[in-house]
Design a protein with these regions (language model features):
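N-terminal Rossmann-like dinucleotide/flavin-binding domain of flavoprotein oxidoreductases
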Residues: 240-260
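Flavin-dependent oxidoreductase catalytic cores
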Residues: 1-207, 211, 216-222, 227, ...
């Protein structure tokens, strides 16, 4: 913001425009609608907002909003987007350090939501139980497997397909929504949520125990076929073993375990 009028320069001036927008929204919808504001704990851009200015702005904005949703990075700067939508080389729950600081501010009185690479119910429960946030937001993991909460409730967490955080779904605003591991995403009208049992049970041989072979075998079994999976090597999973060997590729190792 390089403006020199009443909307630029000092913190108060720079806050004027977004506060006027939030005020107008609240006046328009009244108290019957919850307004959630997403904001970065740290924009990471030189000269951008850091956590102290973020907290200062939330203190002003809380008059007009019901909850604040803490992220990181700046979406208008592509090089900082991997922090806004954390890729697989960043740690899980990496925005919690910002939501924790917002929660600890004695002058912020509204509920705090945190988002960013929170992919399991266990991670979400730990964040909330430790007081680092009041709520947790998930997006990619639920696109990868919308039965996350159902499986957790039933004690079947191991059945949940883990998100790779690979960003296959990221260009959804310009192309059809897709997922690297969930073939149904974006094709819900074509592929039923529960695959029907085959009309005629068959004995099927799948040759090759790589990722595609394992997935084909799992799907065939779900449809009721008698499946034999043949792999020339000594382990299933194919190239995923080599790809996931680096320490930061935790999500791919999780996917490998899920496949098995």
């Amino acid at each position: 913001n390089q403006r020199t009028d009443e909307y630029g320069g000092s913190f108060e001036n720079r806050a004027r425009w977004p506060l006027s927008v939030l005020k107008a929204m609240r006046e328009r919808v009244g108290d019957g609608l919850c307004i959630d504001m997403r904001i970065s704990g740290d924009e990471l851009v030189p000269g951008g907002m850091g956590i102290e200015e973020t907290k200062a702005f939330i203190r002003l904005a809380q008059e007009y909003i019901d909850t604040v949703h803490v992220s990181q990075g700046l979406i208008v700067e592509p090089r900082y987007m991997p922090y806004t939508m954390p890729a697989f080389y960043l740690p899980h729950c990496h925005n919690v350090k910002w939501s924790e600081q917002v929660k600890a501010d004695p002058d912020i009185h509204i509920p705090v939501t945190v988002v960013g690479s929170i992919t399991t119910v266990a991670e979400a429960e730990e964040i909330i139980a430790s007081g680092k946030a009041d709520m947790v937001a998930m997006a990619r993991q639920l696109m990868c497997d919308n039965k996350l909460l159902y499986n957790a409730y039933r004690g079947m967490e191991e059945k949940t397909r883990p998100c790779l955080r690979c960003h296959e779904c990221a260009p959804a605003d310009i192309v059809h929504l897709r997922c690297a591991t969930n073939p149904r995403l974006g094709r819900e009208s074509e592929i039923p949520e529960e695959l029907p049992c085959a009309k005629h049970k068959k004995r099927v041989v799948v040759v090759g125990g790589g990722v595609a072979g394992c997935m084909a075998a799992k799907t065939l079994v779900e449809r009721g076929h008698d499946v034999t999976l043949i792999e020339k090597g000594d382990k299933l999973g194919g190239r995923l073993h080599e790809i996931s060997c680096l320490s930061f590729k935790f999500d791919m190792r999780q996917h490998l375990r899920w496949l098995m």
